Amino acid sequence: MLSRVRGCFLAGACGDALGYVVEFSDDSMIRSKYGKDGITQMDLIGGVAEVSDDTQMDIYTAQGIIHAAEKNCDYEGMVKEIYHSYLRWYSGHVQCVHSSGTCC
């Protein structure tokens, strides 16, 4: 089961990294930059694929759920643990908000 969960996170992160560079682009903009086939490989920065806040939030949500499970929390407790995970994410990204409201 754990390997399936890891696989889901990895596949989601790979898809996010592949599409992150064109997240707010329309089809014509993508084709003009990448050709008729669109994106066929990840843009790497220093050999690393960059993911968006979407993947980061997935990870922090899972972290909150794991913390809640470790503490045998009820639903309300789980929500609080996820909330605290989001605060940890936010505290590392306060300086990083674009004018569009998205994080880098």
Regions found by a protein language model. Give the residues of each.
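Structured, active/binding-site neighborhoods that engage oxygen-rich ligands
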Residues: M1-C104
